[in-house]
Regions:
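Alpha/beta catalytic cores of group-transfer enzymes, especially the acyltransferase/condensing modules
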Residues: 194-242, 352, 378-381, 391-394
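Phosphate-handling active-site elements
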Residues: 152-160, 188-202, 408-421
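Beta-strand segments within the central parallel beta-sheet cores of soluble alpha/beta enzyme folds
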Residues: 113-115, 159-166, 196-208, 317, ...
Length: 441
């Protein structure tokens, strides 16, 4: 955590505010090279400079050539603890180099005018922070909810104009909505609160906004992973104040590329499958008179296997078994990361994937023999990687993405096979990002 705070302080050292044209020129002559390299890596510097210049140019057209800041908030990848957060278990996640960036112009009114590539957002007046049923599931509700969360805690908010673009994959387990929430929270923190609000506090406000204003049940995993930076070990046993530990670690330092593969399977009509996972887990915990599975032990579960089979279901028992072994595995993964033990870490990643496939059962869709893309991706990963590397289903499962740690020497072969099967650009070679939401300039 100390390293992450030091890095964040350096990145947030903005210097004099510049108009957008001057920021573009500063990027062209290399004045932001060091910061951009820190965020995205040396090999991505050229492409990121082009990206930033294009976003700034569009912002100038929309917002005028005003004094501005650039903000960035990362997506995340789940590393361990598949479907454990909703049972108040342990999780390991990491911030990644795919992010949402925004050019922001402060205003002296209460209006947030937010422009984003690909969709339109109505202006939000922060004088009205009431919950609006008509805004359910909208970007406007998230902005209003974050502002409400700030004011409830005694923080300041104010207006701004912004233009943003994101390369965080929507629906791929990278938490694009949480990245947006962290972005807005970081903007309010820097513009109106002297950047004094902690990453953890910004994450909690984002969760509040999503639950209460966006009206979607959300744990704290996504927001915390996007806000804290680097690898983060989380323990949700204390629901209101989860324990979060940032762990500096980079698989690339040990010869592995972190690759997510989007199998291009539709999430449509899968809501029942997703909701069945926490429902069945909680049905088991209820049998023990507990709210969630983290409040029982593996020995208690095993001793009551017959009762669970009779009174709930076989699958519910298996999913509970997955949770209790997976939450402990996440703890062991965090310990391996702290000790820089890549061998143990990768073994645990494979064990996590095995448990998700066998016991959690979120790889195959029941009754659908025509659509088993995640299973195919895992089979191909096993073929290429063998015993060197690791692979697992990533995120909610049933569709979406798988995660693999691929030796550098096999990366080209791995990506080629995946693209031949699932289509061009289905693979995302990720870089671990050592900080969460920041003000770049």
């Amino acid at each position: 955590m100390q390293l992450e705070m030091h890095l964040k302080k350096w990145l947030n050292n903005k210097g004099d505010t510049m108009v957008i044209t001057k920021i573009i020129n500063a990027i062209k002559v290399g004045q932001l090279d060091e910061k951009l390299t820190t965020l995205y890596g040396a090999e991505a510097l050229t492409s990121q400079k082009v990206r930033y210049e294009e976003v700034l140019s569009k912002a100038k057209d929309l917002l005028g050539d005003e004094e501005a800041h650039i903000f960035s908030a990362p997506g995340r990848t789940e590393v361990g603890g598949n479907h454990t957060d909703h049972q108040l278990g342990r999780v390991v996640a990491a911030s990644i180099d795919l992010d949402v960036i925004a050019v922001v112009v402060p205003t002296d009114d209460s209006i947030v005018t937010y422009h984003a590539k690909g969709f339109s957002v109505n202006p939000v007046d922060l004088h009205n922070l009431e919950i609006n049923e008509a805004e359910k599931n909208t970007t406007e509700s998230l902005i209003r909810g974050i502002a409400a969360g700030f004011t409830k805690k005694g923080y300041k908010v104010g207006g701004f104009k912004a233009y943003s673009e994101s390369n965080v994959l929507s629906g791929g387990g990278m938490s694009s909505s949480a990245a947006f929430e962290v972005l807005i929270g970081t903007i309010f923190s820097h513009l109106y609160n002297d950047a004094a609000i902690s990453s953890e506090e910004i994450a909690k406000i984002g969760q509040f906004s999503e639950n209460v204003y966006f009206m979607k049940a959300s744990g704290l995993l996504d927001q915390m992973a996007c806000s804290v930076g680097s690898f983060a070990a989380m323990d949700f046993a204390n629901k209101e104040n989860p324990q979060v530990t940032s762990i500096p670690f980079n698989p690339a330092d040990y010869g592995y590329d972190l690759i997510l593969t989007d199998v291009k399977a539709s999430h449509a009509d899968l809501s029942d499958e997703y909701s069945a996972v926490p429902y069945e887990m909680k049905a088991v915990s209820k049998l023990f008179g507990k709210e969630v599975l983290s409040q029982i032990t593996l020995n208690e579960l095993l001793a009551n296997a017959a009762k669970i089979r009779n009174e709930v279901s076989d699958r519910a028992f298996l999913r509970a078994y997955h949770f209790l072994t997976e939450t402990n595995r996440a703890k062991l993964q965090a310990e391996a990361l702290k000790e820089n033990d890549i061998k143990t870490f990768l073994r645990l990643v494979k064990e996590s994937g095995h448990s998700s496939y066998m016991y959690l059962q979120n790889v195959l869709i029941p009754g659908d023999s025509q659509n088993q893309a995640l299973a195919i991706a895992l089979a191909l990963s096993e073929t290429v990687l063998g015993d060197d590397g690791a692979y697992r289903v990533h995120g909610g499962g049933f569709a979406g993405t798988i995660q693999a740690y691929v030796p550098h020497a096999k990366t080209a072969e791995y990506i080629a096979l995946m693209e031949a099967t699932f289509g061009k650009d289905c693979c995302y070679k990720l870089r671990i990002r050592d900080c969460g939401g920041i003000c770049v300039i």
